[in-house]
């Protein structure tokens, strides 16, 4: 008989004292409450820097499963760059230094591309400010800014405040000038609408497009015509004599400071790929030997990468496989990628001895119409696997508290919590009957806050702590744990040595 060690992830099940708008607290959940009272338990931090996000930012399912499976804090791109700036590593980055060396030796210009806002989804203007300060420190004289206006991840008419903030840094450092301005609708298309990207390219390379004496004038004129940040036409900033402040020329260098790839790929390809055929670039196609992308955008972009992908070696799944143990990953459609791809550190392939079970999520418009989703089918399939003694390690996700929680509707979400509790009982009972151990936790909160203080639906995730219960009475748990500490604790229970790459600390004392 196998004694399974199961990790049960109650997606979106956070803990909060206040019962108002709290579907987790208001639901009848005798199984969870019983385990909480009977077995060793604690809470874990599932948001902010504890999961590699900026301080105070709510967690999400992708990040949660990545951290849990990796057994360490997996820094997301925004935080990774922030930490590099804070710790002084940013200025030493080899790709930045190489681009700077190139323009200084050749007497050419450094161009900074990117989304100018503090939205933090595709970019952060603080990263561009760090580049301006670096250029000033290294004595680069010609630095030009090609600002992509946001209006989508931030308010629709906020560009002026970001231009003002940039001008402050230009004043402070003595380097940098705006060269072109364009709305992200043009510069950051991802749907192969190449006519939009072409307008942007022609402004940057040929100085073609509406001309303005300043970035401020460009924005004011656009607003006067009812065109707001996202949709500002690619425009050229000109000197007093109406010549462009700068265009992109041979041997110039570019640093593209967006860190999220999807909307950066197309415009990057126009500049980096010699075989580019999506539109005719015209006679002037500048040769850019140093085109630096903040992160790895795509195999289709021939540029240098400042922050290379982090290889997550020795995730929980890999370590379990190396120990010769059999593992099962099981979830319904909505969370299947999370218990497989994300849990395995961004790996699609199965490990040796890994089995996967996918149960289809119900075909309904929104899950508040069917709060139980496919939880009973998932549970039946899993209990059957446990009874057949097939696996040493089980990774299970129950999707309901998150997927129904996104509706912001109390009644359906309470039903989702209650269905989750019912099935949690069945699974834990089956595990205990085999003398196994269950670790019950969540990846982030959601169902714990369904209403705002005004009584409006709250559809987002929360920053509340998540539970951690071990159904074994002879263990002691420490306080202050994070999601990255779960895998080390599981390895402790399995009697498998924790690899050095796994920097989380076991929650089991």
Curated annotation (Swiss-Prot):
GO biological process terms held by the UniProt record: glucose catabolic process; glycolytic process; sporulation resulting in formation of a cellular spore
Alphabetized SUPFAM superfamilies for the sequence: 2,3-Bisphosphoglycerate-independent phosphoglycerate mutase, substrate-binding domain, Alkaline phosphatase-like
The entry's cellular-component GO terms read: cytosol
Q: Which reaction does it catalyse?
A: (2R)-2-phosphoglycerate = (2R)-3-phosphoglycerate
**What does the record's cofactor remark say about binding?**
Binds 2 manganese ions per subunit.
Q: What's the EC number here?
A: 5.4.2.12
Query: According to its UniProt record, which residues of this chain constitute the active site?
Result: 61
Q: How does it assemble?
A: Monomer.
Q: Which family, according to the similarity comment?
A: Belongs to the BPG-independent phosphoglycerate mutase family.
- The identity of this protein, by name, is 2,3-bisphosphoglycerate-independent phosphoglycerate mutase
Q: Which organism is it from?
A: Bacillus cereus (strain ATCC 10987 / NRS 248)
């Amino acid at each position: 008989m196998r004694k399974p060690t199961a990790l049960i992830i109650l997606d979106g099940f956070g803990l909060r004292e206040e019962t108002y708008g709290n579907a987790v607290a208001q639901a009848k959940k005798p199984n969870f409450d019983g385990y909480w009272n009977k077995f060793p338990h604690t809470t874990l931090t599932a948001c902010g820097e504890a999961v590699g996000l900026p301080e105070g930012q709510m967690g999400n399912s992708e990040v949660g499963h990545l951290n849990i499976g990796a057994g360490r804090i997996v820094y997301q791109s925004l935080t990774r760059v922030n930490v590099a700036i804070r710790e002084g590593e940013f200025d030493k980055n080899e790709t930045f230094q190489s681009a700077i060396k190139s323009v200084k030796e050749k007497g050419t210009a450094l161009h900074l591309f990117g989304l100018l806002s503090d939205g933090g989804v595709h970019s952060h203007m603080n990263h561009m400010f760090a580049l301006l300060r670096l250029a000033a420190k290294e004595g680069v004289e010609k630095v030009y800014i090609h600002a992509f206006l946001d209006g989508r991840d931030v308010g629709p008419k906020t560009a002026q405040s970001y231009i003002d903030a940039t001008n402050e840094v230009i004043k402070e450092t003595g380097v940098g000038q705006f060269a072109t301005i364009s709305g992200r609708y043009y510069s950051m298309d991802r749907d192969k609408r190449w006519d939009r990207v072409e307008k942007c390219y022609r402004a940057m390379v040929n100085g073609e497009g509406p001309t303005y004496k300043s970035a401020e004038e460009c924005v004011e004129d656009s607003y006067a015509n009812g065109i707001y940040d996202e949709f500002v036409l690619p425009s050229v900033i000109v000197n007093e004599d109406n010549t462009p402040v700068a265009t992109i020329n041979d041997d110039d260098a570019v640093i593209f400071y967006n860190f999220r790839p999807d909307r950066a790929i197309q415009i990057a390809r126009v500049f980096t790929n010699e075989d580019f055929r999506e539109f005719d670039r015209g006679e002037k196609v500048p040769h850019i030997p140093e085109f630096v992308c903040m992160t790895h955008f795509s195999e289709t972009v021939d540029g240098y990468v400042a922050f290379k992908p982090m290889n997550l070696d020795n995730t929980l799944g890999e370590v379990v496989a190396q120990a010769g143990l059999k593992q099962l990953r099981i979830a319904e459609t909505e969370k299947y990628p999370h218990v497989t791809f994300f849990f395995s550190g961004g790996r699609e392939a199965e490990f040796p001895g890994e089995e996967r079970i996918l149960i289809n999520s119900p075909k309904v418009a929104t899950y508040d119409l069917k709060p139980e989703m496919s939880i009973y089918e998932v549970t039946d399939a899993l209990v059957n696997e446990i009874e057949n003694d097939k696996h040493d390690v089980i990774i299970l996700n129950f999707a309901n508290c998150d997927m129904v929680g996104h509706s912001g509707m109390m009644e359906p979400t309470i039903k989702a919590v209650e269905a989750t509790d019912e099935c949690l009982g069945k699974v834990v009972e089956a595990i205990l009957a085999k003398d196994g151990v269950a670790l019950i936790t969540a990846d982030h909160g959601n169902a714990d806050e369904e209403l705002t203080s005004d009584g409006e639906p709250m559809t987002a995730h929360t920053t509340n702590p998540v539970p951690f219960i071990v159904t074994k009475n002879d263990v002691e748990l420490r306080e202050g744990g994070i999601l990255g500490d779960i895998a080390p604790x599981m390895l402790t229970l399995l009697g498998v040595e924790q690899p050095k790459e796994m920097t989380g600390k076991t929650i089991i004392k």
